[in-house]
């Protein structure tokens, strides 16, 4: 083909892809194509069941999703899906999906999830799977959820605990950690302000955040990652797969869900600002939860380039538990990439699978 004609055709293809990406995004979204069954609904939660075509292990794998996100990250592409990977590795997979929370849910807090929804749903999974034990996986905020749930309920159901990108020592989390540490110092200078912020006196409607605000905040926490994704799109407009993947990830990032005010109280004003998990103990309502109560097999992961929760912030969990079987590993990518990137799928998923296979009952 003549070089000029070839260049023109390539430019035409780029314009076509760009036009589709801007004006017809929905038709390009590849996520959540894997079939599943909803086995139970409870309050603000649904339990998805992804049956393994060849179940090899007694204990099912339960993914607990963080709040604010939709479930696309667990089944992102037909050819790169976390749930499909583990299904085809011989595990029945369950995904705890939080429903679309809104302003009416502003009073929900950590205890609503770790002492109500999670116990109910894990019991339901155990009944459905006919297994006393599960392998439990939590990423980001869900890492806090599964850690605190396990600490409260060990050794009831959790045989293997996997915690990824979870802020245990929040002040050690790079620039973000230093920012929260500095704010806490300022707050501590005024007892009235400190009491107002930290004792739950702020009306929940004032600290409830919308999905749109959460989406903006997520991008602002890692602006370089967002800019790199836009750059990659513009440099690869002629590549069909790149454009479809960009549309899929864009849909995930742009369609976030509300954070209830009670959750922001516990996550931002407690976990991040006061950094109690570093000590291994956190007070939630009338419950004192101690991480030393975790005695099961523990797998801790951190993104090698995570700007939100650094490895230094995630790693201390192992030393705060009573587990005699602790594995820590760095995962390729940032806070989002550690769950979804091609490198993660190639390098980390097989490692996590092998770790789980060795600790599961055939």
Predicted region positions:
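Alpha/beta-hydrolase-fold enzymes
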Residues: 2-3, 127, 131, 147-259
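Gly/Ala-rich beta-loop-alpha elbow adjacent to hydrolase catalytic centers
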Residues: 137-146
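Catalytic histidine-centered segment of alpha/beta-hydrolase-like enzymes
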Residues: 308, 333-347
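Catalytic histidine neighborhood in serine/cysteine hydrolases
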Residues: 314, 320-336
